[in-house]
Amino acid sequence: MGQNLALNLANKGWKVVVWNRTVPGKEENVVEHFIANRAKGKGIIGSNELTDFVEALKTPRVILLMVQAGPAVDELTGKLFPLMEKGDILIDGGNSYYEDTERRVKELYDKGMYFVGCGISGGEEGALHGASIMPGGAQEAWSVIQPMLKSIAAKAEDGTPCCEWVGPGGAGHYVKMVHNGIEYGDMQLIAETYFAMKHLLALKNEQMADIFEQWDKGRLHSYLIEITSAILRHKEEGGDYLLYNILDAAGQKGTGRWSVINSLQLNTPLGVIAEAVFARNLSAEKNLRVLMSKHYMHVENHPVYNYQDTVIGLESTLYAARLTGYAQGFALMCTASEQYGWKLNLSTIALLWRAGCIIRSAFLNDIAEAYHRAPGLSHLLLDEHFGREVTEALPAWKKYIGVMLREGLPVPVLSAALNYFLGLTTNRSPANMIQAMRDYFGAHTFERVDSPRGEFFHEHWEDNY
């Protein structure tokens, strides 16, 4: 990804100097190989020594780090500190944890230098041809790096670069973290829909690919829906569909988990993303699942449901569930913005995700418009447009979640989205029983419906016996 970013920058006319660490037996002659092959004729300068690398850059220097999140960032930053001067800018383009970025911003600022935590989404292709870029940190750096970053960003259909200043401190990496959390949920929702389609309709790969391709022409249009169709059609050299031969054990790098942990810290429901993380955890328990499937035999002879009704119902179910996942992610960013004082512009963030990134979707324009109309919107599903869309999808959503569960199909994220929506729209929940139990055994007190919020009571429960 670092090589592709360097090529993208060079293609846009920027002077580029590259350096890479040397790890015997693992990373040797990386720079030489890059300069002699992919970067040949691009005017990119290669350097084997960190000192030479820094000296080759004009001041104020702009240094972009593309290293693994965690200690590696601190290690490399520590080596660069003595070589940099006041006014120099250090950009971390990896998936660093936002709290680490907050610390690094302060550390460099105290030395007269500027640190930028920059979320970059789009993978290797996005890095080369245009990514969604989410910079945040030291505001003073923005005027210097703005032309450079916008030149290599993806362009939305209206020509706007998918790059804009997000906010101070760790805001850029935080928004990228939530982006990745939404991505976890989105992928699991699509996977569960494919699974339901396969079992409820007994369809072949090509038939399912046709359905996803058709959906991609409508309100579900998105990068992930597009590649789902392509994946379903992809065959190996022997003629077998590759998907059949891929082990059902999903990997993860941790950004989804970070989103869930932060949601717990901020007391903000994030069930779609949380269940998506747990679903990956469960998928990794392959040996246990094989053992349990033999111990608890499922009846595999599912009845075949009406094709047209089921396809329409699954489309509505997936649409409503995806929208709910995005709504949860934006609600988390809204809470974080208030809690951390970032003043995030949620409309702008939605616009940043319209192209280049993994979760680019047709309805991001509508999300941006919703927050533009009402910047103080407390929840996306309170928007009139999305409220109408979810209301129309609700009957099918409830029906087909019931169908899937009745047929023994595990759909934890599709059902988590529905449960969240039902809970969100329930005026009187069963939480009064929880508060009563907490007060009964622990004297934790409770509020009353006939008293102002913030006034607490305790009952001597055993006096009634």
Across the structure, where does each feature detected by a protein language model lie?
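NAD(P)+-binding Rossmann beta1-loop-alpha1 motif at the extreme N-terminus of oxidoreductases
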Residues: 1-55, 59-61, 83-87, 123-128
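Glycine-rich adenosine-cofactor-binding loop
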Residues: 1-5, 322, 326-327
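Rossmann-fold dinucleotide-binding core
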Residues: 73-78, 91, 97-209, 217-241, ...
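Interdomain hinge/lid region at the active-site interface
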Residues: 173, 199, 203, 210, ...
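Small-residue-rich helix-loop
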Residues: 214, 337-373
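C-terminal amphipathic alpha-helical interaction region
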Residues: 391, 396-465
